[in-house]
Amino acid sequence: MVFSVSIFASLAPYLVSALLLFFLIEQLSYLVKKRNLPGPLFVPPIIGNAISLVRDPTSFWFKQSDTAGTSPGLAANYLIGKFIIYIRDTELSHQIFSNVRLEAFHPLGHPFGKQLFGDHSLIYLFGEDHKTVRRHLAPNFTPKALSTYSDLQQIVMLRHLRQWEESFSGGTKPVSMRDLVRELNLETSQTVFVGPYLDKEARNTFCTDYNLFNLGSMALPINLPGFAFNKARRAVMNLEKTLSVCAGKSKKRMATGEEPTCLIDFWMHAFVTEIESGNPPPLHSEDEAIGGLLFDFLFAAQDASTSSLLWAVTFLESHPKVLSKVREEVAKIWSPQSGHLITADQLAEMKYTRAVAREVVRYRPPATMVPHIATNDFPLTESYTIPKGTIVFPSVFDASFQGFTEPNRFDPDRFSETRQEDQVFKRNYLAFGWGAHQCVGQRYALNHLVLFIAMFSSLFDFKRLQSDGCDDIIYCPTISPKDGCTVFLSKRIVTYPNL
């Protein structure tokens, strides 16, 4: 024992020297990559500023944006061994989105996405492989498919709205909407994506696993047993396995000639039709691969929709004239007492309500950044080249407040047929991405938001519980109001729709 201590004591100076040398090299590497970009001159060894990010992501990212505002739209930092660049300028962000290819930039979906999602995710496909998969996804979002989903969305929404009315209506007790909306969206996603293929027990397990994934996506990326990140990775594996079983069941059902009733059915129906025509099975048509792609849909839809629905309630309450116009438009087209769901044609008529939905997404884009990794050195400007291995964060949020008329004002009329700012400032409307990896389900997502706005505003009166900073942004992992959108609810109608 004494011998071991003496050996350690003799080696200690060398170990300390080696550690200090490593820290010095790390700092010098950071400064060389940073060059003249604004950003911290010193970063904590190894972990960088990851603790600041995890402790208060809102403050961290706003600080990056402010720092980038002092330069041509760029700011540097360091996170767990990775040099990062925050991109505030819209045109510089377009250079990233327009150069998603093997030799330039790879999307990540999450700063440590490959560890979390695995390599098979749609996010990480490129070239012909990516084009082929997206082409086979097209049947999932035809007008017929979207109309089928619309009915399912409304049925789930009405069931949850009825529960809210029974539990919280009366206007005497405030309720935080975050968990209510999250549960609504999770059931909607399950029902629309895999419908009849999940029993009650599977749905409960599904919810538990998704919550573990959600928590882990916000944690430090420590992939060891007992840590939240590791639990999230295991939850993803469980979710993908569950979804792959659903894919197999759907394939068998579609092979019998039955009509599609959910997203996986439309997808598998197209696969079965192609194979019956004598073509080989499409790429990534194995049950396991489809399970992974279905999880991509779930990840893209779930938290983004939760964010948008919460902000919609927030802004409708704070803009009574907008709320009044929504109610007036919806009442002319659909009545809760009609005994019918909103049809596809009626949904298309709700032009102002759709403009409100688009403005909600512009004003508070759910995913504020879209991280990519540079696979090679990339000359971004005349004076700065992004080093290979850098994680870049093009800011969708900052782009939303550039170009548009009075961008800091919540103004749905900017999307009217008269002003058409969605076309005039199209390059600044990046909430659904840009280029080859643009969101394939954006029409579904907007329909979901429009349906919720129409139904919620028709069925409920609502008043926010005002508190200091209630509208401040927090990340969980998409952005939402700090107070969880806490409101007083009271019903507007005498009888609840019986649909």
Swiss-Prot record:
Report the GO molecular function annotations: C-22 sterol desaturase (NADPH) activity; heme binding; iron ion binding; monooxygenase activity
> Which reaction is this enzyme known to catalyze?
5-dehydroepisterol + NADPH + O2 + H(+) = ergosta-5,7,22,24(28)-tetraen-3beta-ol + NADP(+) + 2 H2O
Q: Which positions in this protein are listed as binding heme?
A: 439
Q: Which domain of life is it from?
A: Eukaryota
Q: What class of enzyme is it?
A: oxidoreductase
Which pathway is this protein engaged in?
Steroid biosynthesis; sterol biosynthesis
Induction entry: Not induced by pathogen infection.
Name the cofactor(s). Answer: heme
Q: What is its EC number?
A: 1.14.19.41
Tissues of expression:
Expressed in the vascular tissues of roots, shoots, stems and leaves. Expressed in root tips, carpes, siliques and seeds.
A GO cellular component term found in this entry reads:
membrane
Compartments reported by the entry: Membrane
Q: Name one GO biological process term.
A: sterol biosynthetic process
Q: Which family, according to UniProt?
A: Belongs to the cytochrome P450 family.
Q: What else is known?
A: Plants overexpressing CYP710A2 show higher levels of brassicasterol/crinosterol and stigmasterol, and lower levels of 24-epi-campesterol/campesterol and beta-sitosterol than the wild-type.
The protein's job, in short, is: No activity with campesterol.
Per its record, how is this protein called by name?
Cytochrome P450 710A2
Species per Swiss-Prot/TrEMBL record: Arabidopsis thaliana (Mouse-ear cress)
Q: Which gene encodes it?
A: CYP710A2
